[in-house]
């Protein structure tokens, strides 16, 4: 033990104890030379950092070289941005320390992007930082493993220790820092030059101001510029022609063409919208061959009911953005690079959606999703969009998981959907279902023994295993579709269902791999029991529900009516300009289209359909455990004693257990459904007063809970 302490003491002395050292004249001449030509060295270091970051992002030295060759000016512009950041060192005496921090900053961002791209197609952007707390709170998923967490913590810890040592023992600039002089003026000039040079670079097509394909944009214009644009380019730009007169002109054009709604919340059909996570028809992939059709139900519905391609805004990840377009009718192309509106504008602004439109005519509106309620800030977003209820996994009694153990199976969503219908017997329902069963990561090692569906056309063994896993999970999704439509067929209620893939799976697919020629195209299918004619059409995600409601005689809402009347216009530019104008007006403008009022306020979202209650509490025979009995408990049910959470064990949907030492006679017990970050989604309908059998009570106190 003494030897260990001696070694640690030596390390401490070497790294963290400052000792005066007399340097040679040659050392000081070298330092003077570096200071004199520091701008040149900064330029060289900046280019080196950008090149290294591109190697990490592309995971290929050759690809990084091709980027420099094919997009030399973009590479130089990325280097300029890093060079400007290095100019900050002139404000400090510990310039070596400042240079290491700046170098570490860009390198760490590049490493994170490389890690992200190893698991999905969409590169790392600023908005992803807002998802980190939710990712860290999610256990047993491919988003963030314990191994990744350990590597991140150890790596950042080591870097922090190195910075401390450098701060203590590193060199310090001894010359005069002219804070109010030339240095500060030079720094100001450099930073002022950024928007000017950016504008020039965009106007000369050195870089782009908008990425129709964010993954391709990062490839073409570099990580540093692209990530920086996600930081500063958020929200919507105000259209040049935005004013009350132009908004009213668009509204008048729509009003002159729109039809009248012919149903209401009692006579209208139930509408179900199903997001099929990462769903892709294997027949659409040119190289992939499957031994037999894994999605026969999907293909049968595609053949007999309205269907088509669906243009979505993301590939490989970003479910929330496809969801946003589909529910609101608004387009992601007008937002900043890589932005998630759920994490930005919808944090403070309510937003018209299909839910609020249908609520106006008496529909009950629901969301059912077997993943965490807080992920993508969905609980907040669904409230802002006007939904009545949201049943997330915390409100479900989930027992079955996918073969890789990461995600709940989707079969539970059928019964949970039926609950939404049964809860409102006198109303028509709009229920939005979000599946997760086909979610990545797709294991590159064999996971399923003797899989029913096997693939060929894939040479790499790891990718062959991944595709095998994926197509077998597609079959599970297909079974879910059949179970859902079969169950709906049993009900004597008019119903229409629309199902769609939110994006292609994270499998590195390219445009050339797809029969459609576009990795931003998925498919949608429909089902109905109303005898509606088959009308195939290729749509954008933001047009899907406008088209669906149009077929059943529902013509409600500013945006939905806009699409219903204008989406078939031969003037595509005018159609997009009008959408841009209305979208800005609703989210960022003065809401001229609502006459300046808040027509669609946020709802008081109720989490779950089933009520949670406590029916009895009793001690175990051993006296060391207390059992809480009730209804509709889940794995996310937590016991609170006098409003403070205590450790509890889930035993069944009707029984929870706590330690006897955590409760005292007369304490008040409640059961809460708890999400990530200890968010309480729902409390038990009643509180229960604990009566300790070891304490004498009068008869009145013993009957308080009856």
Which functions belong to the PLM regions below?
Residues 2-217, 666:
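Transmembrane and membrane-interface helices of multi-pass
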Residues 120, 129-140, 149, 225-234, ...:
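Short alpha-helical interface patches
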Residues 99-102, 126-129, 221-226, 468-478, ...:
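Short, well-ordered coil↔helix boundary/capping segments
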Residues 259-265, 273-276, 281-706:
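Solvent-exposed soluble domains appended to multi-pass membrane proteins
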Residues 194-273:
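Membrane-interface segments at or immediately adjacent to transmembrane helices
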Residues 129-132, 220-224, 247, 295, ...:
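Alpha-helix initiation and N-capping motif
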């Amino acid at each position: 033990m003494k030897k260990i302490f001696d070694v640690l003491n030596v390390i401490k002395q070497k790294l963290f104890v400052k000792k005066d050292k007399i340097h040679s004249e040659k050392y000081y001449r070298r330092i003077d030379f570096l200071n004199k030509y520091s701008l040149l060295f900064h330029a060289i270091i900046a280019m080196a950092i950008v090149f290294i970051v591109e190697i990490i992002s592309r995971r290929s030295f050759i690809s990084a070289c091709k980027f420099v060759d094919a997009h030399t000016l973009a590479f130089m512009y990325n280097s300029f941005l890093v060079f400007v950041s290095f100019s900050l060192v002139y404000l400090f005496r510990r310039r070596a320390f400042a240079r290491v921090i700046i170098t570490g900053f860009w390198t760490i961002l590049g490493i994170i992007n490389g890690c992200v791209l190893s698991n999905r197609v969409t590169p790392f952007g600023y908005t992803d930082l807002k998802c980190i707390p939710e990712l860290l709170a999610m256990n047993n998923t491919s988003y963030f493993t314990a191994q990744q967490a350990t590597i991140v913590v150890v790596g950042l810890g080591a870097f922090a220790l190195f910075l401390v040592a450098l701060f203590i023992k590193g060199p310090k600039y001894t010359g005069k820092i002219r804070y109010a002089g030339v240095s500060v003026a030079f720094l100001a000039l450099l930073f002022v030059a950024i928007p000017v040079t950016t504008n020039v670079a965009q106007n000369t097509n050195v870089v782009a101001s908008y990425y129709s394909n964010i993954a391709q944009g990062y490839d073409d214009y570099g990580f540093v510029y692209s990530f920086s644009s996600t930081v500063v380019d958020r929200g919507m730009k105000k259209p040049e022609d935005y004013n009350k007169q132009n908004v009213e002109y668009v509204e008048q054009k729509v009003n002159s063409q729109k039809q009248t709604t012919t149903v209401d919340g009692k006579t209208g059909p139930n509408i179900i919208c199903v997001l099929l996570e990462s769903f892709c028809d294997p027949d659409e992939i040119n190289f992939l061959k499957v031994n037999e059709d894994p999605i026969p139900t999907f293909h049968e519905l595609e053949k007999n009911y309205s269907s088509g391609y669906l243009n979505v805004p993301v590939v490989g990840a970003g479910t929330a953005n496809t969801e946003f377009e589909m529910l609101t009718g608004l387009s992601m192309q007008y937002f900043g690079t890589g932005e998630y509106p759920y994490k930005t504008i919808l944090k403070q602004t309510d937003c018209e959606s299909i839910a609020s439109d249908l609520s106006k005519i008496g529909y009950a509106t629901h969301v059912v999703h077997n993943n965490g309620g807080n992920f993508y800030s969905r609980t907040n977003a669904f409230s802002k969009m006007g939904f009545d209820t949201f049943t997330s996994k915390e409100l479900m009694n989930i027992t079955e998981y996918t073969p890789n153990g990461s995600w709940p199976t989707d079969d539970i969503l059928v019964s949970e959907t039926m609950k939404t219908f049964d809860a409102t017997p006198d109303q028509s329902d709009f229920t939005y279902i979000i599946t997760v069963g086909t979610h990545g990561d797709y294991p590159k090692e064999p996971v399923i023994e003797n899989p029913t569906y096997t693939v060929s056309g894939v040479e790499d063994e790891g990718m062959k295993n991944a595709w095998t896993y994926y197509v077998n999970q597609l079959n599970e999704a297909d079974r879910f579709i059949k179970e859902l439509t079969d169950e709906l067929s049993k009900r004597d209620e008019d119903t229409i269902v629309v199902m769609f893939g939110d994006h292609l799976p994270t499998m590195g697919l390219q445009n050339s791999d797809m029969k459609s020629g576009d990795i931003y195209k998925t498919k949608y299918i429909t089902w109905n029991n109303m005898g509606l004619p088959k009308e195939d059409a290729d749509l954008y995600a933001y047009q899907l529900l406008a088209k669906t409601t149009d077929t059943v005689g529902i013509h409600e809402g500013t945006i939905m009516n806009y699409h219903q009347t204008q989406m078939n216009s031969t003037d595509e530019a005018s159609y997009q300009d009008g959408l841009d104008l209305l979208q800005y007006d609703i989210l960022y403008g003065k809401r001229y289209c609502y006459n300046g009022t808040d027509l669609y306020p946020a709802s008081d979202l109720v989490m779950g359909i089933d009520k949670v209650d406590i029916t009895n509490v009793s001690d175990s025979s051993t006296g060391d455990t207390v059992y809480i009995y009730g209804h509709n408990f889940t794995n996310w049910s937590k016991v609170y004693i006098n409003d403070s959470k205590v450790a509890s064990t889930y035993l069944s949907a009707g029984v929870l257990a706590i330690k006897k030492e955590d409760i005292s006679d007369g304490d008040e017990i409640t059961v809460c459904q708890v999400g990530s970050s200890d968010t309480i989604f729902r409390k038990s309908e009643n509180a229960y007063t604990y009566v300790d059998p070891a304490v004498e009570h009068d008869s009145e106190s013993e009957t308080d809970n009856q």
